[in-house]
């Protein structure tokens, strides 16, 4: 697996298969999530940006960090399940009210082996 990008040592792909590998065991659903809330400083900056239009960089950065954390937690959960890969990886988001949002990463934790050519 040295030629593939991994997260916490786990191959993570959005596809049902990994080229050059075969699934030999399904371990279950791997998942990881995080809830993020804004703070008054970000809210003020966002309000000012909203007045003139355009991207709200403070929120974009916060959500990017949240996605990376959810992805890392999902990979760690897959490792706990005994997997070395996650296939069919997806993100989900939900608004928890006010200025809080949940980012959830999930996929199928599997054990894969390299296919000999």
From Swiss-Prot:
Pfam families: YbjQ_1 (PF01906). It comes from the Archaea. InterPro entries: UPF0145_dom_sf, UPF0145_YbjQ-like. Belongs to the UPF0145 family. This is UPF0145 protein PH1682.
């Amino acid at each position: 697996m040295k030629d593939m990008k991994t997260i916490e040592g786990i191959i993570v792909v959005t596809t049902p298969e990994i080229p050059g590998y075969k699934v030999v065991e399904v371990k279950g659903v791997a998942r990881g999530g995080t809830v993020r809330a804004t703070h008054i400083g970000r809210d003020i900056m966002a309000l000012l940006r909203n007045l003139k239009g355009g991207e709200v960089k403070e929120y974009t950065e916060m959500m990017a960090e949240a996605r990376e954390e959810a992805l890392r937690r999902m990979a760690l959960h897959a490792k706990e399940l005994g997997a070395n890969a996650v296939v069919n990886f997806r993100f989900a988001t939900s608004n928890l009210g006010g200025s809080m949002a949940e980012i959830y990463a999930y996929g199928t934790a599997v054990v894969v082996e390299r296919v000999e050519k």
